[in-house]
Protein backbone atom coordinates (compact mmCIF):
# COMPACT_ATOMS: atom_id res chain seq x y z
CA UNK A 1 0.00 0.00 0.00
CA UNK A 2 1.36 3.39 -1.02
CA UNK A 3 1.91 5.89 1.78
CA UNK A 4 -0.99 8.35 2.13
CA UNK A 5 -0.52 12.06 1.53
CA UNK A 6 -0.75 14.21 4.63
CA UNK A 7 -3.05 16.82 3.05
CA UNK A 8 -5.99 16.47 0.68
CA UNK A 9 -5.37 18.22 -2.65
CA UNK A 10 -6.61 21.54 -3.91
CA UNK A 11 -7.93 21.21 -7.46
CA UNK A 12 -8.00 24.36 -9.61
CA UNK A 13 -10.02 24.10 -12.79
CA UNK A 14 -12.03 26.13 -15.28
CA UNK A 15 -12.32 26.69 -19.00
CA UNK A 16 -9.09 27.67 -20.66
CA UNK A 17 -8.37 31.44 -20.62
CA UNK A 18 -10.41 31.96 -17.45
CA UNK A 19 -7.63 33.03 -15.09
CA UNK A 20 -6.80 29.76 -13.35
CA UNK A 21 -3.05 30.35 -13.74
CA UNK A 22 -3.43 33.58 -11.78
CA UNK A 23 -5.21 31.74 -8.98
CA UNK A 24 -2.54 29.05 -8.93
CA UNK A 25 0.10 31.74 -8.59
CA UNK A 26 -1.69 33.18 -5.58
CA UNK A 27 -1.82 29.76 -3.93
CA UNK A 28 1.85 29.28 -4.73
CA UNK A 29 2.55 32.54 -2.88
CA UNK A 30 0.67 31.08 0.10
CA UNK A 31 2.97 28.08 0.22
CA UNK A 32 1.00 25.47 -1.75
CA UNK A 33 3.14 22.97 -3.65
CA UNK A 34 2.45 22.82 -7.39
CA UNK A 35 4.99 20.16 -8.32
CA UNK A 36 7.20 20.01 -11.35
CA UNK A 37 5.05 22.14 -13.58
CA UNK A 38 5.25 24.38 -16.62
CA UNK A 39 4.92 28.15 -16.61
CA UNK A 40 1.14 27.84 -16.36
CA UNK A 41 1.33 25.76 -13.17
CA UNK A 42 0.28 22.55 -14.93
CA UNK A 43 2.11 19.50 -13.62
CA UNK A 44 4.01 18.01 -16.55
CA UNK A 45 3.80 14.34 -15.57
CA UNK A 46 0.21 14.38 -14.34
CA UNK A 47 -0.82 16.28 -17.48
CA UNK A 48 0.48 13.31 -19.47
CA UNK A 49 -1.77 11.03 -17.39
CA UNK A 50 -4.87 13.14 -18.01
CA UNK A 51 -4.18 13.68 -21.70
CA UNK A 52 -3.76 9.94 -22.17
CA UNK A 53 -7.06 9.32 -20.38
CA UNK A 54 -8.98 11.89 -22.44
CA UNK A 55 -7.47 11.24 -25.85
CA UNK A 56 -10.20 8.83 -27.02
CA UNK A 57 -13.11 11.12 -26.15
CA UNK A 58 -14.37 13.64 -28.75
CA UNK A 59 -12.61 16.95 -28.09
CA UNK A 60 -11.49 15.48 -24.76
CA UNK A 61 -14.96 15.90 -23.23
CA UNK A 62 -16.34 12.59 -21.94
CA UNK A 63 -19.95 12.28 -20.91
CA UNK A 64 -19.78 11.85 -17.16
CA UNK A 65 -22.17 8.88 -17.27
CA UNK A 66 -19.76 7.10 -19.63
CA UNK A 67 -16.60 7.72 -17.61
CA UNK A 68 -14.66 4.75 -16.33
CA UNK A 69 -12.66 4.96 -13.11
CA UNK A 70 -9.05 3.75 -13.47
CA UNK A 71 -8.27 1.24 -10.73
CA UNK A 72 -5.02 2.79 -9.55
CA UNK A 73 -5.41 6.49 -10.33
CA UNK A 74 -4.68 7.71 -6.81
CA UNK A 75 -1.68 5.41 -6.52
CA UNK A 76 -0.29 6.78 -9.78
CA UNK A 77 -0.69 10.37 -8.63
CA UNK A 78 0.86 9.75 -5.24
CA UNK A 79 3.68 7.84 -6.87
CA UNK A 80 4.57 11.13 -8.55
CA UNK A 81 4.39 12.94 -5.21
CA UNK A 82 6.70 10.37 -3.63
CA UNK A 83 9.30 11.02 -6.33
CA UNK A 84 8.97 14.76 -5.64
CA UNK A 85 9.10 14.19 -1.86
CA UNK A 86 5.83 16.08 -1.49
CA UNK A 87 3.63 13.74 0.55
CA UNK A 88 3.77 16.03 3.57
CA UNK A 89 3.01 19.28 1.74
CA UNK A 90 -0.13 21.26 0.97
CA UNK A 91 -0.46 20.54 -2.75
CA UNK A 92 -2.50 21.63 -5.71
CA UNK A 93 -3.22 20.50 -9.22
CA UNK A 94 -4.27 23.09 -11.78
CA UNK A 95 -5.75 22.03 -15.10
CA UNK A 96 -8.84 22.62 -17.23
CA UNK A 97 -8.99 18.85 -17.71
CA UNK A 98 -9.79 18.29 -14.04
CA UNK A 99 -13.35 19.47 -14.71
CA UNK A 100 -13.73 17.30 -17.78
CA UNK A 101 -13.02 14.14 -15.77
CA UNK A 102 -14.08 15.38 -12.36
CA UNK A 103 -15.66 12.09 -11.30
CA UNK A 104 -12.31 10.30 -11.65
CA UNK A 105 -10.63 12.82 -9.38
CA UNK A 106 -13.54 12.85 -6.96
CA UNK A 107 -13.37 9.07 -6.63
CA UNK A 108 -9.64 9.23 -5.94
CA UNK A 109 -9.84 12.24 -3.61
CA UNK A 110 -13.37 12.61 -2.20
CA UNK A 111 -12.19 15.16 0.39
CA UNK A 112 -10.39 17.44 -2.06
CA UNK A 113 -11.25 21.12 -2.22
CA UNK A 114 -12.11 22.43 -5.67
CA UNK A 115 -11.75 25.94 -7.06
CA UNK A 116 -13.89 26.47 -10.16
CA UNK A 117 -12.53 29.50 -12.00
CA UNK A 118 -15.05 31.50 -14.01
CA UNK A 119 -14.88 34.33 -16.50
CA UNK A 120 -17.55 35.98 -18.63
CA UNK A 121 -18.30 33.75 -21.61
CA UNK A 122 -17.71 36.49 -24.18
CA UNK A 123 -14.33 37.31 -22.64
CA UNK A 124 -13.26 33.66 -22.75
CA UNK A 125 -14.26 33.41 -26.41
CA UNK A 126 -12.39 36.58 -27.37
CA UNK A 127 -9.31 35.42 -25.50
CA UNK A 128 -9.40 32.03 -27.24
CA UNK A 129 -9.70 33.73 -30.63
CA UNK A 130 -6.63 35.87 -29.90
CA UNK A 131 -4.45 33.17 -28.32
CA UNK A 132 -2.15 31.42 -30.77
CA UNK A 133 -2.08 28.01 -29.12
CA UNK A 134 -5.88 27.77 -28.89
CA UNK A 135 -6.16 26.18 -32.31
CA UNK A 136 -8.80 23.47 -32.07
CA UNK A 137 -11.47 25.53 -33.84
CA UNK A 138 -9.15 27.01 -36.42
CA UNK A 139 -9.59 23.56 -37.96
CA UNK A 140 -12.66 23.66 -40.21
CA UNK A 141 -13.11 19.91 -39.96
CA UNK A 142 -13.53 20.22 -36.20
CA UNK A 143 -16.12 22.95 -36.68
CA UNK A 144 -17.96 20.89 -39.30
CA UNK A 145 -18.14 17.91 -36.95
CA UNK A 146 -20.18 20.05 -34.55
CA UNK A 147 -22.26 21.69 -37.25
CA UNK A 148 -20.56 25.09 -36.95
CA UNK A 149 -19.03 27.45 -39.49
CA UNK A 150 -17.45 30.19 -37.38
CA UNK A 151 -14.62 29.73 -34.90
CA UNK A 152 -16.39 31.72 -32.20
CA UNK A 153 -19.33 29.28 -32.34
CA UNK A 154 -16.90 26.47 -31.60
CA UNK A 155 -15.56 28.29 -28.56
CA UNK A 156 -19.08 29.05 -27.34
CA UNK A 157 -19.82 25.31 -27.46
CA UNK A 158 -16.54 24.69 -25.63
CA UNK A 159 -17.42 27.02 -22.76
CA UNK A 160 -20.90 25.54 -22.48
CA UNK A 161 -19.40 22.05 -22.18
CA UNK A 162 -17.38 23.26 -19.21
CA UNK A 163 -20.44 24.90 -17.69
CA UNK A 164 -22.25 21.56 -17.83
CA UNK A 165 -19.38 19.98 -15.91
CA UNK A 166 -19.44 22.75 -13.30
CA UNK A 167 -23.16 22.18 -12.71
CA UNK A 168 -22.55 18.43 -12.36
CA UNK A 169 -19.77 19.03 -9.84
CA UNK A 170 -21.89 21.31 -7.70
CA UNK A 171 -24.95 19.05 -7.88
CA UNK A 172 -22.80 16.03 -6.94
CA UNK A 173 -21.84 17.80 -3.73
CA UNK A 174 -18.15 18.35 -4.39
CA UNK A 175 -16.46 20.61 -1.86
CA UNK A 176 -16.00 23.54 -4.22
CA UNK A 177 -15.96 27.30 -4.52
CA UNK A 178 -16.56 29.37 -7.63
CA UNK A 179 -13.95 32.10 -8.14
CA UNK A 180 -14.24 35.15 -10.43
CA UNK A 181 -10.68 36.54 -10.87
CA UNK A 182 -12.03 39.63 -12.66
CA UNK A 183 -13.05 41.01 -9.26
CA UNK A 184 -9.38 41.59 -8.56
CA UNK A 185 -9.18 43.84 -11.63
CA UNK A 186 -11.02 46.51 -9.62
CA UNK A 187 -8.89 45.85 -6.54
CA UNK A 188 -11.43 43.59 -4.81
CA UNK A 189 -9.46 40.76 -3.19
CA UNK A 190 -12.17 39.85 -0.68
CA UNK A 191 -13.29 36.66 -2.43
CA UNK A 192 -9.69 35.53 -2.78
CA UNK A 193 -8.91 36.31 0.84
CA UNK A 194 -11.91 34.26 1.99
CA UNK A 195 -10.85 31.41 -0.28
CA UNK A 196 -7.35 31.30 1.18
CA UNK A 197 -8.90 31.16 4.65
CA UNK A 198 -11.29 28.38 3.53
CA UNK A 199 -8.32 26.39 2.26
CA UNK A 200 -6.68 26.62 5.67
CA UNK A 201 -3.80 28.73 4.36
CA UNK A 202 -2.22 31.96 5.51
CA UNK A 203 -2.72 35.07 3.37
CA UNK A 204 0.46 36.55 1.90
CA UNK A 205 0.32 40.33 2.14
CA UNK A 206 2.49 40.65 -0.98
CA UNK A 207 -0.24 39.16 -3.17
CA UNK A 208 -1.85 42.46 -4.33
CA UNK A 209 1.57 43.95 -5.06
CA UNK A 210 2.49 40.99 -7.28
CA UNK A 211 -0.90 40.35 -8.88
CA UNK A 212 -2.06 43.93 -9.62
CA UNK A 213 0.51 44.55 -12.42
CA UNK A 214 -0.59 41.32 -14.10
CA UNK A 215 -4.12 42.71 -14.37
CA UNK A 216 -3.22 45.98 -16.10
CA UNK A 217 -4.36 44.81 -19.53
CA UNK A 218 -7.72 43.64 -18.18
CA UNK A 219 -8.03 46.92 -16.30
CA UNK A 220 -7.53 48.89 -19.53
CA UNK A 221 -10.22 46.83 -21.25
CA UNK A 222 -12.63 47.50 -18.39
CA UNK A 223 -11.95 51.24 -18.51
CA UNK A 224 -12.56 51.28 -22.27
CA UNK A 225 -15.84 49.39 -21.80
CA UNK A 226 -17.01 51.86 -19.18
CA UNK A 227 -16.10 54.81 -21.41
CA UNK A 228 -17.76 53.45 -24.54
Mark where each language-model region is:
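C-terminal accessory extensions appended to soluble enzyme cores
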Residues: 205-228
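Residue-level detector of family-conserved "landmark" positions at structurally sensitive sites
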Residues: 37-39, 179, 206
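PAPS-dependent sulfotransferase catalytic domain
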Residues: 87-204
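Electropositive, surface-exposed helix/loop patches at the edges of structured domains
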Residues: 65-86, 158, 162, 225
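Flexible, charged surface loops at secondary-structure boundaries
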Residues: 4-6, 80-88, 171
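PAPS-dependent sulfotransferase catalytic core
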Residues: 1-77, 211-219
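Generic detector of well-ordered alpha-helical segments enriched in charged/polar residues
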Residues: 47-51, 55, 74-82, 122, ...
